[in-house]
Amino acid sequence: MPALNPNDFALHDIHLFPVCVFRPEHATPGYAPRWEGEIDTLMRHGEPFVIVYVELDNDESHDDRKHRAVWLKQNKVALGAVCKALVSVEPDPDRRAEVAAQGEVAVKAFGIPHHAVASFGQAVSLAARLTRQHSGNDALQTGQQA
C-alpha cells in the first residue's frame, strides 16, 4: 500500500490519518479535479478513513459541485469501501440538526454515512471507532467475539 505524504494534499489535512480534515480555504473555484486526485490517492492507500468538515461553508461553485457529484456517483462503491463516514462538526445544536438532515440527502445519493457532531474531539473519536471497526484488526475482532 502506498504511503501517504501530507505534503501531497492541499484540500485535506491528513496529519491525523485516518482523520482527513477538509480545508475549505483551499477549495477555490476549479478545485474539483484536485479534490478528485486527493480522494483517489486516499482510496488507493486502501486503509479506512473518515473525512471531517469543521467549517461548513457552502460556497462551492456549480461546476465544482457537478464535477464532484458525477465522480461520487461513478465511484460510490470503491469510495464506500474505504471512506467510512463524512463527519460535520457543528457546535450549535439547532444548526447541527440542520446539517444532519442535509447529510441524509448525501447518504441517499452517494451511500457514504454522515454524522454531525458538536466538537472536533467527538469527530476524532468517532473516526477512530469507525475505522477500527472496518480495519480488519483480527486481534480486536477476536477479542470482541470471545
Regions of interest found by a model, annotated:
Residues 2-146:
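Amphipathic, Lys/Arg-enriched alpha-helical "gate/interface" segment within cytosolic domains
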